[in-house]
């Protein structure tokens, strides 16, 4: 569903109508809010929602999807190239591939997954200039 100028998903786009949905890529669309409809799917493993822009090219996805870490089978979230701001959610090692790169205003605490990052069991894709706290194993410029 990439490159379609979508602003929302249909009401039919949910776990009960798509029970075998494993991967969902909504990148390069126009979502200003994270679509939560498919998150209850027991099969969903990866969501990509990178590069959400309005018609003028402005970054419009600013809010972290609250509750994303409780999605039952999600292991990968690609939410880079947006304008995500403060992340108030505690990360879990269940979601072990996280792309937050090119979110210049992000502020996130990764203390809860630092031991997994250090052990190579959690892949955080980030920029060295981002406000990422709680893990000295990362090469962050302050």
Give the role of each language-model region.
Residues 85-142:
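Leucine-rich solenoid repeat scaffolds
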């Amino acid at each position: 569903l990439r490159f379609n100028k979508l602003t929302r998903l249909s009401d039919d786009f949910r776990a009960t109508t798509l029970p075998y949905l494993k991967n969902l890529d909504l990148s390069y669309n126009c979502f200003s809010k994270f679509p939560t409809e498919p998150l209850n799917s027991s099969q969903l493993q990866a969501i990509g929602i990178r590069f959400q822009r309005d018609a003028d090219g402005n970054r419009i996805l600013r809010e972290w999807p609250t509750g994303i870490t409780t999605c039952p089978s999600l292991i990968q979230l690609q939410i880079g190239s947006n304008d995500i701001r403060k992340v108030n959610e505690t990360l879990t090692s269940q979601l072990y591939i996280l792309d937050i790169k090119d979110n210049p205003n992000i502020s996130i605490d990764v203390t809860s997954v630092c031991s997994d990052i250090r052990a190579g069991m959690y892949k955080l894709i980030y920029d060295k200039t981002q406000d990422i706290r709680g893990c000295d194993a990362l090469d962050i410029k302050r």
